[in-house]
From Swiss-Prot:
GO terms for molecular function: acetyl-CoA carboxylase activity; ATP binding; carboxyl- or carbamoyltransferase activity. Keywords: ATP-binding, Cytoplasm, Fatty acid biosynthesis, Fatty acid metabolism, Lipid biosynthesis, Lipid metabolism, Nucleotide-binding, Transferase. The gene is accA. Acetyl-CoA carboxylase is a heterohexamer composed of biotin carboxyl carrier protein (AccB), biotin carboxylase (AccC) and two subunits each of ACCase subunit alpha (AccA) and ACCase subunit beta (AccD). The lineage of its organism: Bacteria, Pseudomonadati, Pseudomonadota, Gammaproteobacteria, Moraxellales. InterPro entries: Acetyl_CoA_COase_a_su (IPR001095), ClpP/crotonase-like_dom_sf (IPR029045), COA_CT_C (IPR011763). This is Acetyl-coenzyme A carboxylase carboxyl transferase subunit alpha. It is an enzyme of class 2 (transferase). Its main location: cytoplasm. It comes from the Bacteria. GO terms for biological process: fatty acid biosynthetic process; malonyl-CoA biosynthetic process. It is found in: Cytoplasm. GO terms for cellular component: acetyl-CoA carboxylase complex.
Length: 273
C-alpha cells in the first residue's frame, strides 16, 4: 500500500511537469476576455516570468496575475522558465495596488519551480520582494483567489499565493521544496525523489485534507489531454469562489483571510487555534 501511494504522488509530480500541460496564458485566453497586459515594476524593469493585467471575468472587470513558463526555447528564455525575479513580484505589487484602488477582484495563477535563485535576484532583494508581496496580499481589501496550475514551488509560489480561497488542479503540486531537492537533503541523492514526493504531502487531495486548499478541480488523467474541459471546470470553480467572497464586507473578508492563515497546522499539531 505504501509503495502504491508513493507511486501515485510521484506520478502526480510528472503530470504537473508535463511539457504539453496548459500554462497561464492558455487559461487567460479561455477563461477571461479583454485581457490587457501591464508591464514593469517602475523600479528596475519588466519580468517576463510574471504576467499580469486587466481583464473581464463573466463581464466583470478584474485583475489577473500569473506565472508563465513558455514552451519553445525562445519563449522559455523570455519568461525565464516561470522563475520570477524581484521585479516580477514588485510588478505584481503594483498591479495589486491598482486592483485595490479600483476595487477589482484579483485572480492569481501559480506555476513555478520557485523564485529565480540567481545572484542578481538576491542583490536586488528577492527575499524582501516576496515578503512584501505576502504582507500586501494578507491585507488587500478586495477578493483574492489563487489557483495552482502546475508546480507551486516554495516562496516563489507563495509570493502570489496568499488568498481568500486557494484552488488546485487535481494533478498540480504545492510544496516547500521539490522532491529532488528534498531527497538530496535527506538522503544525499535525488534518486529518492519518488519517496520524497510522498513525504512532502504535495498533492491537491492531501493539501485539501489539511485545509490549505479549498477546492480541487478534476482534470481526469491530466489537463494536457483535454485542456478545454479542464479550463471550463476551473472557470466554474472560480465563479463559485468569487460569488462567495463578493457579498462580504472588506474588513470581514480580511479578517477571515487572516484567520485562514493562522489556523494552518493547528489541528494536526494539536494546537489551539
Amino acid at each position: 500500500m505504501k509503495k502504491a501511494t508513493q507511486s501515485k504522488a510521484w506520478t502526480t509530480v510528472q503530470i504537473a511537469r508535463h511539457p504539453e500541460r496548459p500554462q497561464f496564458l492558455d487559461y487567460v485566453g479561455e477563461i477571461f476576455t479583454e485581457f490587457d497586459a501591464l508591464h514593469g515594476d517602475r523600479l528596475f524593469g519588466d519580468d517576463g516570468a510574471m504576467v499580469g493585467g486587466l481583464a473581464r471575468f463573466d463581464g466583470q472587470p478584474v485583475m489577473v496575475i500569473g506565472q508563465h513558463r513558455g514552451r519553445s526555447t525562445r519563449e522559455k528564455l523570455k519568461h525565464n522558465f516561470g522563475m520570477c525575479n524581484p521585479e516580477g513580484y514588485r510588478k505584481s505589487q503594483r498591479l495589486l495596488d491598482m486592483a485595490e484602488r479600483f476595487n477589482l477582484p484579483v485572480f492569481t495563477f501559480i506555476d513555478t519551480m520557485g523564485a529565480y535563485p540567481g545572484v542578481g535576484a538576491e542583490e536586488r532583494g528577492q527575499a524582501e520582494a516576496i515578503a512584501t508581496s505576502l504582507a500586501q496580499l494578507s491585507s488587500l481589501k478586495v477578493p483574492v483567489i489563487a489557483t495552482v496550475l502546475g508546480e507551486g514551488g516554495s516562496g516563489g509560489a507563495l509570493g502570489i499565493g496568499v488568498a481568500d480561497r486557494v484552488i488546485m488542479l487535481s494533478h498540480s503540486i504545492y510544496s516547500v521544496i521539490s522532491p529532488e531537492g528534498c531527497a538530496s537533503i535527506l538522503w544525499k541523492t535525488a534518486e529518492k525523489a519518488a519517496q520524497a514526493s510522498e513525504a512532502l504531502g504535495l498533492t491537491a487531495d492531501k493539501l485539501q485534507s489539511l485545509g490549505i486548499v479549498e477546492y480541487v478541480v478534476d482534470e481526469g488523467e491530466g489537463a494536457h489531454l483535454d485542456p478545454e474541459r479542464v479550463m471550463q471546470n476551473l472557470k466554474v470553480v472560480l465563479k463559485q469562489a468569487l460569488d462567495e467572497l463578493l457579498p462580504m464586507d472588506a474588513n470581514e473578508r480580511c479578517e477571515a483571510r487572516y484567520q485562514r492563515l493562522m489556523k494552518f497546522g493547528s489541528e494536526n499539531l494539536g494546537m489551539a487555534s
